[in-house]
Every structure is written in C-alpha cells, then in structure tokens.
Swiss-Prot record:
Protein name (Swiss-Prot/TrEMBL): 5-oxoprolinase subunit A
GO molecular-function terms, A-Z: 5-oxoprolinase (ATP-hydrolyzing) activity; ATP binding
NCBIfam families: PRK05406.1-3, PRK05406.1-5
Primary gene name: pxpA
GO biological process: carbohydrate metabolic process
EC code(s) of this entry: 3.5.2.9
InterPro entries: Glyco_hydro/deAcase_b/a-brl, LamB/YcsF/PxpA-like
Domain of life: Bacteria
Reactions catalysed: 5-oxo-L-proline + ATP + 2 H2O = L-glutamate + ADP + phosphate + H(+)
Enzyme class: hydrolase
Function statement: Catalyzes the cleavage of 5-oxoproline to form L-glutamate coupled to the hydrolysis of ATP to ADP and inorganic phosphate.
Family: Belongs to the LamB/PxpA family.
Subunit structure: Forms a complex composed of PxpA, PxpB and PxpC.
Taxonomic lineage: Bacteria, Bacillati, Bacillota, Clostridia, Thermoanaerobacterales
Length: 254
C-alpha cells in the first residue's frame, strides 16, 4: 500500500483581505502550512487555522516568510543569518501560542516564497532557517525540495526533512522550480493533476521535457490558487485510482 502526504499553504488572508478557501480545502489534505503574519496572515486567521487543524486532524505546519506583505513574501530580501533566524523564531513563537491554545502542536516548518527558494540555493539562508528550527524544537521537521542547501544542511544537523513536490508549479531541468515570472512557472487543471500523480510515483517532467527523478514525501497545492479546492479534489480522486492514499507523513504507514 502506498501513501503520500498532500499539503496546502493556507491562512494567507489578513484583515479584510481574503485569500483562498481555507476550510474548504482541509478535508482534502493531510497537512497545512499556516502563514505567520510576516508575508500574510494575522492573529485572527492564525487562531482559526489552528482550530481547523485540530478539528480536521491534519498536521499543523508553520509557513514563515520574509517580512513583506506588499510583495506577498515573494521578493528576495537580504538579511543577515541572525536576522533570518530571529524572524523565524518570532513567527514560530506566534503560531505556537495559537497552537497551544487549541491543544495541537506544530509538526513542521515550510519556509514561504522567496525564503523557501533562497534556502535551496544560499548556504547562509539555509543555515539560518535550519538553526531557527533546531533551537525552537529539534523534533519539528523541515519541508523543502529533495535536494539543495536546506535539504543538505538540515539533514546533516539531524533534523527530519520532508521532501516536497509541487503539483501546480513548473520544474527546471535541475529540479528547481521555474521562477514565477518565467513561462511555464504554473501548472493548472489536468496538467497539474497529472504532475501530482507523477510526483507520487517518483518522477516529474521539466519544462524542456527532461524527466527528473523526484522522490517526495509530500505534494503541495497552493491555497491562494483560485482552483485549489477543485484541484485537490481531482488529485485525491486520481491518487485513489492509482491505489495511492493521502495520509499525513508522521502517521505510521503499513
């Protein structure tokens, strides 16, 4: 029997600005990554997401980013290692308080946007992210691409690393994601569903047609995608057709 974790980035609304359908996607995934107020999210949204994590029994992850509401955390901003570590500790502490109030715990950390991408290629950023998780709680896992600096450094530190693939993003031949400002960056509809199935089976096709080996533990559906709920429904259905079951990565598997 084969299993795969399906995760969604949620909690990216704040104030009167609404993004995604958080509760609608909860029955369709096994893990969530909650924005922690720097790139998106606020104290009311974070509290609600922790409540939903408890009600639906999904893994609760922190989704910290650069302090960049204007750019939705998708702009690379130069910070020192100490600044990056501390900005993550700040965000982890905030989400942890809401999680504790709901009787749940943070199981993983997945950096957001530019911070995620920077940690893949920049040693200093990867070290800062890994250190933040280590000093906050070394039992918490890090979610990242199945290669790159963060994967290597976190593994060397003895942290649990969850290898991630993306249903709705294009891939470069070297396994990195296609930058959002380039052609082929996004996958939609049946193309995204097909890519999710391929990832669950251990491979993915790059924008140039190259087939890449991609052993992943979890597959992401971006919650800010307007078709996220429909996409997650289709992915669930097609995975079942392949006898692949959606299950949170921390649960014991047969």
């Amino acid at each position: 029997m084969k299993y795969i974790d399906l995760n969604a980035d949620i909690g990216e609304s704040y104030g009167n600005f609404k993004v995604g359908e958080d509760e609608a996607i909860l029955p369709l995934v096994s893990s969530i990554n909650v924005a922690c107020g720097f790139h998106a999210g606020d104290f009311m949204v974070m509290a609600e997401c922790c409540k939903l994590a408890r009600e639906y029994g999904v893994n609760l992850g922190a989704h910290p980013g650069y302090p960049d509401l204007w750019g939705f955390g998708r702009r690379s901003i130069p910070y020192t290692k100490e600044e990056i570590t501390n900005m993550l500790l700040y965000q982890l502490g905030a989400l942890s308080a809401f999680a504790r109030a709901e009787g749940v715990k943070i199981t993983h950390v997945k950096p957001h946007g530019a911070l995620y991408n920077d940690a893949v290629v920049k040693v200093e950023v990867a070290e800062a992210v890994a250190r933040a998780v280590w000093v906050f709680d070394a039992e918490i896992a890090i979610v990242t691409l199945p290669y790159g600096r963060l994967f290597e450094i976190a593994s060397e530190m003895g942290l649990t690393v969850i290898r991630e693939g993306f249903a709705d993003r294009g891939y470069l031949p070297d396994g990195r994601l296609v930058p959002r400002n380039q052609e082929g960056a996004k996958k939609t509809g049946d193309e995204a569903v097909a890519q999710a199935i391929a990832l669950a089976e251990g491979w993915v096709k790059a924008v140039d047609g190259t087939v890449i080996k991609a052993e992943v533990d979890t597959i992401c559906v971006h919650g800010d995608n307007i078709e996220a709920v429909k996409l997650a429904q289709k992915i669930n259905r097609e995975l079942l057709n392949k006898n692949i079951y959606v299950q949170a990565w921390r649960k014991k598997r047969a």
